[in-house]
């Protein structure tokens, strides 16, 4: 029987820090000991990160909106969101770390502008964000990469 393929979602939990992202990768790569039922769960198979291009995602008014939450990383919503983003090079750094631990690397690319990341490395799989399931221009660009399991001919 095949085992379930488990992906550890990093998302924005790295708070804009490569070191935190790598720590999460370290944790995902370890088995989990569950003491109540005396189980040892195997490590996850992959980690997933998300790459966004805020200039394609947010309007000027959204970017410049004051953002004074106690948990804000900037004076405006744009500054806050920009702080949380890792660069292409930082994604590559996390990718290399994950691969060194034997993990697959999955990437959600949220816009065509994010395809620049693919100049540095090729993730094992691409994931489509649920909000982009009908974003045909993005889906076509992602399918053309031939990363993962589907091709342009297989699209619906």
Segments predicted by a language model, with ranges:
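Active-site-adjacent beta->alpha loops and helix N-cap segments on the catalytic face
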Residues: 17-19, 88-91, 114-116, 128-146
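Glycine-rich anion/phosphate-binding loops
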Residues: 15-31, 88-89
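Residue-level detector of conserved catalytic or cofactor/ligand-binding positions
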Residues: 146-156
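Generic N-terminal amphipathic, Lys/Arg-enriched alpha-helix
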Residues: 1-13
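A structural motif corresponding to the C-terminal end of an alpha-helix
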Residues: 36-41, 89-105
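Glycine-rich, proline-tolerant flexible connector loops at the mouths of alpha/beta enzymes
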Residues: 12, 16, 35-85, 114, ...
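Hydrophobic faces of well-ordered beta-strands that scaffold small-molecule active sites
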Residues: 6-8, 45-49, 105-108, 124-128, ...
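Conserved, mostly hydrophobic/aromatic
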Residues: 9, 28, 118
């Amino acid at each position: 029987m095949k085992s379930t393929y488990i992906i550890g979602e990093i998302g924005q939990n790295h708070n804009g820090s490569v070191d935190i992202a790598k720590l999460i990768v370290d944790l995902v790569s370890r088995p989990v000991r569950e003491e109540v039922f005396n189980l040892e769960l195997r490590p996850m198979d992959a980690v997933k990160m998300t790459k966004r291009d805020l200039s394609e995602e947010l309007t000027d008014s959204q970017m410049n909106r004051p953002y004074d939450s106690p948990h804000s990383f900037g004076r405006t919503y744009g500054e806050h969101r920009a702080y949380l983003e890792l660069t292409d090079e930082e994604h590559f750094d996390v990718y290399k770390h994950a691969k060194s631990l034997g993990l697959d690397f999955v990437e959600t690319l949220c816009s065509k502008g994010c395809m620049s990341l693919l100049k540095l490395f090729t993730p094992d799989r691409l994931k489509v964000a649920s909000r982009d399931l009908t974003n045909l221009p993005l889906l076509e660009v992602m399918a053309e990469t031939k990363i993962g399991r589907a091709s342009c001919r297989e699209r619906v």
